[in-house]
């Protein structure tokens, strides 16, 4: 039996500071700016609040239900509302939070978690193991809308897949509080002890448990098969804040939770998250002092602040890559690995990055798993990069491969590149077209509204397209998305790759597990060129000079320990 104990959050008392104050003239400027570009909210300089912070994000909210959410905008808020058994620190390391200690059985199949006796809900009620049991069973029986969010439960928890399937067949009449779950590996041994039984060892279970779906929710507030309650506010939470106001298209306001396990370390009393999709309006609001933090600025704005203390490059475990539909619904050319390899070799990633704004914003990515995801002894990406790559820019070899596949000036390869009409995607499309045409490929564009883009990709409606994905828990979360079973309509259909991922899931030794995932990544990217990695993401943000102490909770900005000065 392996026993794990960790200290809870180290005290951050040293980070506490004074309440922000600004001059009356600055306040009036901010108020006038707010009248034209923002919903009515407290200004960043409002001295009536004990300690407040205004943070602008780029998208509106879709849900604050932990069982349902998979979107970044929601996570900015959820990250501050809930604490789970574990959390990720700024370096991506797993730290205990509500979990005081845990044990793992010798066969790696049973995890026993002991909840801290100091863990309480915001209304003062004790956090219990049954809260976690209800939350997990509710997530498994929610319905089809959260299939992606519960993927880790289904993959690893004993009986979870069968339970979820039965719940979905019964529909909304299924009641997780009364339905038999004796065959599901989720149980409360007592009020403070949660036991999880796995169907196979999982070397990174505690990392998975940092995700939203593993957070506790209360049965008396979080109803089954519905998420409307999550926008209503005034429900108990376990994290540093509670939701006190929400308009999902405009803003969410969170106030300090005095019953949070580490409440003494929380320095910011209130945070307002503002939905501001217009990047220029967000930059203007920052300039006038109406907002303290701007998380959704353009590269051009970021370049204007380059070299200043106000520019914060937010690290993001996200990849930007090209997916090729090599399966049944794809074109004939995409089934030829030499053609796929030629398209990869024709891309000058360094030039692509330079045009987009430089590697401070978009570092080149050669493997599929991006930076920021832990490997064995280093990041997974650093370990992979150390072995080198064969798919480096080589237009001459690209031409040779195309010729060998029967494509030349008299019979050029013709492809259709699909992308969505937002962000940097149009610029990327134009540069890719130029690079591919330089090796004799004719390129047409298909630009699609962002709201329907991913639905079309899920249905296999593309030849080659841009794609992106963010995760923080394990390299396997990036790789397994291209297994046949994880795709709605497969664009990659390779039994060997499927088996490589399945075999990796069975490995309990961390070093061997990571080795197996590196081999799977090489098979996906280098050997078969099913996908073409292009870029990592670093999101540029602006932070006023009077704001100090912003950090990361996993891959999301975290402001609970911020202080503000004059």
What is the predicted role of each segment?
Residues 56-106, 236:
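N-terminal lobe/hinge region of extracytoplasmic solute-binding protein
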Residues 182, 353, 444-453, 477-545, ...:
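Extracytoplasmic/peripheral linker and loop segments enriched in polar/acidic and small residues
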Residues 226, 259-304, 442:
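Ligand-site clamp/hinge motif
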Residues 333-375, 428, 521-533:
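Periplasmic-binding protein-like
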């Amino acid at each position: 039996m392996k026993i794990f104990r960790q200290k809870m959050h180290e005290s951050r008392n040293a980070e506490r500071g004074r309440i922000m104050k600004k001059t009356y003239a600055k306040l009036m400027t901010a108020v006038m700016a707010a009248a034209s570009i923002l919903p009515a909210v407290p200004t960043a300089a409002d001295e009536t609040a004990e300690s407040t912070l205004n943070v602008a994000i780029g998208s509106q909210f879709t849900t604050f239900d932990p069982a349902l959410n998979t979107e970044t905008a929601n996570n900015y808020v959820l990250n501050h509302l809930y604490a789970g058994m574990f959390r990720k620190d700024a370096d991506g390391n797993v730290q205990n939070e509500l979990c005081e200690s845990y044990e793992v059985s010798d066969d790696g199949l049973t995890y026993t978690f002991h909840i801290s006796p100091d863990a309480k809900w915001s209304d003062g009620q004790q956090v219990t193991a049954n809260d976690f049991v209800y939350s997990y069973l509710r997530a498994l029986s929610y319905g089809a809308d959260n299939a992606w969010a519960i993927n880790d439960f289904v993959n690893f928890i004993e009986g979870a897949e069968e339970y979820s399937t039965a719940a979905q067949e019964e529909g909304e009449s299924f009641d997780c509080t009364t339905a038999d779950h004796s065959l599901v590996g989720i149980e409360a041994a007592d009020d403070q002890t949660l036991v999880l039984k796995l169907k196979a060892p999982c070397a990174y279970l505690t990392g998975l448990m940092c995700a939203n779906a593993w957070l506790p929710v209360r049965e008396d507030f979080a109803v089954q098969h519905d998420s409307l309650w999550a926008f209503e506010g005034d429900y108990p939470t376990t994290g540093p804040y509670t939701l006190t106001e929400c308009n999902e298209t405009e803003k969410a306001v969170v106030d300090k939770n005095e019953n949070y396990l580490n409440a003494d370390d929380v320095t910011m009393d209130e945070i307002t998250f503002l939905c501001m999709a217009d990047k220029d309006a967000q930059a203007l609001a920052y300039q006038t002092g109406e907002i303290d933090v701007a998380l959704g600025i353009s590269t051009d704005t970021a370049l204007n602040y380059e070299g200043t203390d106000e520019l914060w490059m937010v690290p993001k475990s996200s990849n930007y890559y090209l997916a090729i539909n090599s399966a049944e619904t794809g074109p004939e050319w995409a089934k030829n690995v030499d053609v796929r390899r030629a398209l990869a070799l024709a891309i000058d990633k360094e030039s692509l990055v330079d045009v987009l704004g430089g590697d401070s914003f978009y570092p080149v990515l050669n493997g599929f798993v991006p930076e920021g995801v832990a490997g064995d002894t280093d990041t997974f990406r650093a370990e992979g990069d150390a072995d080198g790559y064969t798919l480096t820019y080589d237009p001459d070899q690209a031409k040779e491969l195309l010729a060998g596949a029967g494509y030349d000036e008299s019979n050029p390869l013709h492809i259709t590149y699909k992308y969505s009409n937002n962000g940097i995607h149009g610029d990327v499309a134009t540069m890719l077209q130029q690079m591919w045409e330089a090796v004799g490929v004719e390129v047409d564009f298909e630009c699609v509204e962002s709201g329907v883009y991913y639905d079309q990709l899920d249905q296999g409606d593309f030849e080659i397209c841009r794609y992106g994905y963010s995760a923080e828990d394990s390299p396997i979360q990036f790789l397994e998305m291209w297994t046949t079973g994880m795709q709605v309509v497969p664009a990659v259909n390779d039994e060997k790759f499927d088996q490589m991922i399945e075999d990796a899931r069975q490995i309990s030794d961390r070093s061997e597990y990571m080795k197996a995932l590196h081999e799977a990544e090489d098979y996906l990217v280098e050997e078969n060129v099913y996908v073409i990695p292009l870029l990592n993401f670093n999101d540029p943000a602006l932070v006023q000079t009077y704001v100090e102490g912003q950090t990361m909770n996993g891959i999301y900005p975290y402001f609970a320990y911020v202080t503000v000065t004059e």
